[in-house]
Curated annotation (Swiss-Prot):
Subunit annotation: Homodimer.
Entry's family note: Belongs to the class-II pyridoxal-phosphate-dependent aminotransferase family. Histidinol-phosphate aminotransferase subfamily.
Modified residues (N6-(pyridoxal phosphate)lysine): K217
Protein name: Histidinol-phosphate aminotransferase 1
Phylogenetic placement of the source organism: Bacteria, Pseudomonadati, Pseudomonadota, Betaproteobacteria, Burkholderiales
Keywords: Amino-acid biosynthesis, Aminotransferase, Histidine biosynthesis, Pyridoxal phosphate, Transferase
Cofactors, names only: pyridoxal 5'-phosphate
Gene that encodes it: hisC1
GO molecular function, one term: histidinol-phosphate transaminase activity
Gene3D superfamilies assigned to the protein according to its UniProt record, in alphabetical order: Aspartate Aminotransferase, domain 1, Type I PLP-dependent aspartate aminotransferase-like (Major domain)
Catalysed reaction, written as an equation: L-histidinol phosphate + 2-oxoglutarate = 3-(imidazol-4-yl)-2-oxopropyl phosphate + L-glutamate
């Protein structure tokens, strides 16, 4: 009798599924979500819009009106195309699949977004991780050396980086782009609503650079919509491996509606940036903590005992992310999503109970 073990790849059999904890009843500060719902009148208007969606029809594979609205709203440079994905994760998978020649490699700073490595390995690409410096800034010399040695097909630069919050220096990125002429440079701006800089306006300057974004961190994580901006030469090829109906009709309608109300989402992002500053100051004042600078909607914090702090917060019904086992540079670190003022107050109260002194 045939079993899964007879058919499925050995590396897949050795894997575990990506863990997503049940957050029911918790203050949920583990996944970098916007804590704010839509204002009630806007939510009601969206509901009316969604009630008109033809659920019996397949979605438009390339929704022209939505793409045009997205280009205008996000300031996509002339000469660039836009490719939609079911979240950034699908775009990463499409790029991995399209670039998966025998012996090809993917390179990224580590610690970084886990999907770069996971997607590469699923496409049977070799992943090369280049450690950050001890202060979690980019080790440019190590990156340049690794690029010269490995000649990767894809180089990912998260801008800012998750889970560290680091916003790499533009001059350093320019050096990497110049050195990696044989590579595709993917600048991942998932957390751009909380950063002060963007590479999107420069996407047309370089023939080997694409910029990836998502609407998740802006406040729309539930609709799973990511987009890639870059040269038509690249996006035409990636479009060939895109599932034909990958963006469902409800996601398309929601995005089309809310792109007309970006002022609401931008105001929420501004509130979260202010909360980030306040929260960082208050956490840094707690005994035994080190708060790393962050340009995202989260804080990376080193504590005396990450596992103990994580468990103590769970007892107080506050869920954060213990990242201390992800990489040696993250030893005794937890990642705290910036929540609403009330959520942050509960987090601070729980941290005061969890930290000795």
């Amino acid at each position: 009798m045939t079993t899964p073990q007879d058919i499925i790849r050995r590396d897949v059999l050795a894997m575990t599924s990506y863990p997503v904890p049940d957050a029911s009843g918790f203050v949920k500060l583990d996944a970098m979500e916007n804590p704010y719902p839509l204002p009630e009148p806007l939510a009601a208007a969206l509901g009316e819009r969604l009630a008109q969606v033809a659920l019996n029809r397949y979605p438009a594979p390339r929704p022209a009106a939505l793409l045009d609205k997205l280009r205008h709203a996000m300031g996509v440079p002339a000469g660039c195309e836009v490719l939609l994905g079911n979240g950034s994760d699908e775009i990463i998978s499409m790029m991995s699949m399209a670039c998966a020649k025998p012996g090809a490699k993917v390179l990224a700073p580590v610690p970084g977004f886990v999907m770069y490595e996971l997607s590469a390995k699923l496409a049977q690409l070799e992943f090369v991780g280049v450690p950050l410096k001890a202060d979690l800034t980019l080790d440019v010399d190590a990156m340049l050396a690794a690029i010269a040695e490995h000649r990767p097909a894809i180089v990912y630069l998260a801008y800012p980086n998750n889970p560290t919050g680091t916003l790499y220096d533009d001059a350093d990125i320019e050096r990497i782009v110049a050195a990696a002429r044989h590579s595709l440079i993917v600048i991942d701006e998932a957390y751009q609503p909380f950063a002060v800089r963007s590479w999107l306006p420069r996407a047309a300057e370089f023939d080997n650079v694409v910029v990836m974004r998502t609407v998740s961190k802006l406040g729309l994580a539930g609709i799973r919509l990511g987009y890639l901006v870059g040269s038509p030469a690249w996006l035409t090829e990636f479009d060939k491996v895109r599932p034909p109906y990958n963006i469902n009709v409800l996601t398309q309608a929601t995005a089309d509606f809310l792109l007309d109300h970006l002022d609401v989402l931008d105001a929420q992002a501004a509130d979260l940036r202010a909360e980030r500053t306040r929260l960082a100051q208050e956490v840094a004042a707690l005994p035994g903590t080190t708060v790393f600078p962050s340009a995202g909607n989260f804080l990376l914090v080193r504590v005396p005992d990450a596992a103990a702090v994580f468990d103590a917060l769970l007892t107080e019904r506050v869920l954060v992310k213990n990242v201390s086992k992800m990489h040696p540079l993250l030893a005794e670190c937890v990642r705290l999503t910036v929540g609403s003022p009330d959520e942050n107050a509960r987090l601070l109260a729980a941290l005061k109970l969890a930290l000795p002194g």
